[in-house]
Curated annotation (Swiss-Prot):
PROSITE patterns: G_TR_2, IF2
Gene name of the encoded protein: infB
Skewed-composition ranges (Basic and acidic residues): 137-177
Protein name: Translation initiation factor IF-2
Function according to Swiss-Prot or TrEMBL: One of the essential components for the initiation of protein synthesis. Protects formylmethionyl-tRNA from spontaneous hydrolysis and promotes its binding to the 30S ribosomal subunits. Also involved in the hydrolysis of GTP during the formation of the 70S ribosomal complex.
Amino acid sequence: MSQQTTIRKLAELVNTPVDKLLVQLAEAGMKFSGPDQVVTSTEKMKLLGFLRRTHGKAETSAEAASEAAKKITLNRRKLQEVTVNAGRTKTTVNVEVRQKRTYVKSENEGSGRAAPMTPDEERADILRKLEESRQRNLEEQQRLAESDRVRDEAIQRKREEEQAAKDRAEAERKAAEEAAAAASAPAPVADAPTPSAAAPAARSPSSPSSAPRAARPAGASPASRPAAPARADDRSNAAKHKTRGSHVMVAGVEDDDATKRFAGQLHLSAADRARRSNVRGKPTGRPGSSSSRRGNDNGRGGSQANSGPHGFERPTAPVVREVAIGETITVADLAQKLALKGGDVVKALFKMGVMATITQSIDHDTAALVTEELGHKAVRADNADFEDALLAHAEDAQGEATSRPPVVTIMGHVDHGKTSLLDYIRRTKIASGEAGGITQHIGAYHVETGRGVISFLDTPGHAAFTSMRARGAKITDIVVLVVAADDGVMPQTKEAVAHAKAAGVPLIVAVNKIDKTGADPLRVKNELLAENVVAEEFGGDTQFIEVSAKVGTGVDTLLDAISLQAEVLELKAVAEGRASGTVIESSLDKGRGPVATVLVQQGALKRGDYLVCGIQYGRVRALFDETGHQPASAGPSIPVQVLGLSGVPEAGDDFVVVDDERLAKDVAQQRETKRRESRLVASATNRMEDILAQMGKGEGQQVLNLVIKADVQGSVEALKQSLVALSNEDIRINVIHSGVGGITESDANSAAASKATIIGFNVRADASARKIVESNGIDLRYFSIIYDVIDQVKQVASGLLGVEIREEIIGIAQVRDVFRSSKFGAVAGCMVIEGVVKRSKPIRVLRDSVVVFEGELESLRRFKENVDEVRNGTECGIGVKAYNDVKAGDQIECFERIEVARTL
């Protein structure tokens, strides 16, 4: 620093404002008038000394040395390990404790001495004062430890008293139980040894030795009891040598209990630790002592091993669950019952070869297999509670069984006169009411004749109504097989015989149309012999009646035969009580709602009864017979129409009358759930089969979507079966929706979404449906005869198939020799040996009957003239385009491609 340093420059060097520096110089006794005055070195040192005195620092090195002589610093460092609880495990942490203590000699002590002390004397004086301070700390620590010991002893005495009282109460309870057991036990024999006197004394609650023995904890021997006071003395002795503010022992003795207790609180002083110990009231935790945390039964700090039933024990064996599975169950529900994740169940199904999603339903067998695969037990769930109640209602129809009318089903081939025969019997014109003169419904009628009441079921004879005929044979008592004498046995005749035999129903053969020329009843009998239908005149048990439905010949004889057969069968039923029976036909009437034609088989069906019919239920609002009248009730073997159901039931469903609507609703809902689950399982299976089929067949198969609506349920079934049967490997008929009733807006929307054709069988579309049909260009067709439906669908399906390209060989030429031409290259000299070779048609070159080239002709000549065709037995020259490897002996095959319309 230069001697000519100004105050401003000095302020910049020491990083101090100029005004502040001027003030400090003035306080140091140096007056300056401005910042531009020069500061000498002497003035700088004087300012520095002033500032050091102000901040308590020595001005010179000598003063600093004397200042350092007045100060002594003691540094201590200790390493120890602290155990920290981290959840269920314990972690050991290394902790280093550093202590620094500085002693400064006061000014008063230095000024009171006459002469300065030597360094040894100063050190001795410092050590003496430290010892005095340590003694004061030890006395304070000893006082705190003594108060802690007194408090612990009081707590220990209180716990021992509580434990003794508890043991005495337990001993009294055991003594009372033993006394009660001894009183209830049989008297001992005379020579039994008497109990010792020590036993009653041990059981007595007043025994002086019982309380200490009971109070002694398990596993603690008498020899270990005196160890507790000894450890307490050790702790009190160690506390005498402990320094205030530190847990480290001065005399080399450590307080283990305090170290463990305050292991995580090293920052606390001894006074704070003593105060917290008093507030907590913890036991000392000495091993082997009754006040130990591990041995304390009432303390909160008990170990996990002694926690009793509140501790969690890890299961050592897998849990095997018993899973109740119904007919179907979703994968998610099965996973929930198995206490597994849905993905685990899906993986198990994949391993078994079943491709299913978590929301998909699987059947009982598949669910049971995957349950067993996962190590659990599958049992079948009992879901038949409502069904059992319904069965009990059906069996509750008690009463006397009386004779009932027979149920007769008229069966036979189409146009053999079944409805005309029934028409003559009823004296009505039923046949004229059917479209096309053929029966397309099951007609149920009961006729009162001179021989009693007879219920007739008229079934259709067309091949499409197989299910109707089977249903009619199932619920009938007698089958009348109508066979035309001029036609003989036809396919549906054989089918009707098979249905009757399968149902175990007696058969009566009515040979119709005997008034026609060419009628041959004997031929009918001989043809039926091949179907194991043997006439009585041939030694069999089947009645053959020759009738004419047109003129009425033999009708009375037929009725007599029916009555005779009914008497042989001895048909009986309970005429009173709850009704039960079968649905023959069902439909949806726009004015009346769902209408079901039922045949009562037991009991009496009355208006107001609650009815369960398949998945439908309801209260009978009205009953109608075939003439339109409303009877009060319908007994056994009487067909009636029922109004009031919740929906259109399936033909062939059974119905039962129940007491209340609640049971009817529960049964219907349970059946609907089962049917829906079964349908989901079937649809899932069909989807997988369709995927695999499409993978195998590629995209070549065409699909024709249909929406079918009919007037009755039986017609819907017949249409679905007949149309789906038209499917083949090239086209598939897919019925996306079917139902009973008129064509609604919902049906039209379904057809528009799937680009389907709507078929209305004896039904029409309403205004809203027609509007959607017109706006979307949907193909809507109305029919009244099932023949026309099948023919039209065949035509539409054939149009989807398109045309098939076929190849037809029109001529073959034999190569005799090969010539070379500069214009055409190799020219084959040929002889046409078959058909005609045309210039405009494609050709193939065959060598040893193997095709070696396919192309077209470039030239066809006859005597150097170009010709269009060469016929059989004529020589010609053929130039093959883009092929020069023609050899003698080859054959040139000429063919043409033609388009052929494909049909079903």
